[in-house]
Amino acid sequence: MTVRLGQIMHVNPNYYDEYEKRHSDLPVKFPEMKKALKEAGAHNYSIYLDKKTGTLFAYLEVDDMDKYKAIAEMDACKEWWAYMAPLMDTNPDKSPVTFDLPEVFHLD
């Protein structure tokens, strides 16, 4: 069953362009990360930025939540987190601070 996820994160001021650039470079610099997301059935993945506040809104659909959650233990993911950490609010393990949002409406 496909699960729809919505999350809020924060990118630090003055790093908006760099945040976007690093995501554009993900398929080339971090192909293992892209592969892991695809293998977990992640699709329809988008991240939006509110440049007034630095708030990021991520939306994605995941076909296998167990595989998706396991990505956090992969070296490729930890390297990605370390690469992105200077730009964002992060936890001690360098993972981004995220807030999961409950879905309150959906229209197919």
Curated annotation (Swiss-Prot):
Chief location: cytoplasm
Record-linked InterPro entries: Dimeric_a/b-barrel, L-rhamnose_mutarotase, Rham/fucose_mutarotase
EC number(s) given by UniProt: 5.1.3.32
Keyword Cytoplasm: yes
Pathway field: Carbohydrate metabolism; L-rhamnose metabolism
Catalytic activity, as annotated: alpha-L-rhamnose = beta-L-rhamnose
Entry annotation: catalytic residues: H23
Keyword Transit peptide: no
GO CC term (a single one): cytoplasm
GO BP terms in the entry: rhamnose catabolic process
Keyword terms, alphabetized: Carbohydrate metabolism, Cytoplasm, Isomerase, Plasmid, Rhamnose metabolism
Molecular-function GO terms, alphabetical: L-rhamnose mutarotase activity
Binding-site positions, substrate: Y19, Y45, W80, W81
Compartment(s): Cytoplasm
Subunit structure: Homodimer.
The family this protein is said to belong to: Belongs to the rhamnose mutarotase family.
Functional summary from the UniProt entry: Involved in the anomeric conversion of L-rhamnose.
Cross-referenced HAMAP family: L_rham_rotase (MF_01663)
Protein name in UniProt: L-rhamnose mutarotase
Source organism per UniProt: Ligilactobacillus salivarius (strain UCC118)
Taxon lineage: Bacteria, Bacillati, Bacillota, Bacilli, Lactobacillales
Gene assigned in the entry: rhaM
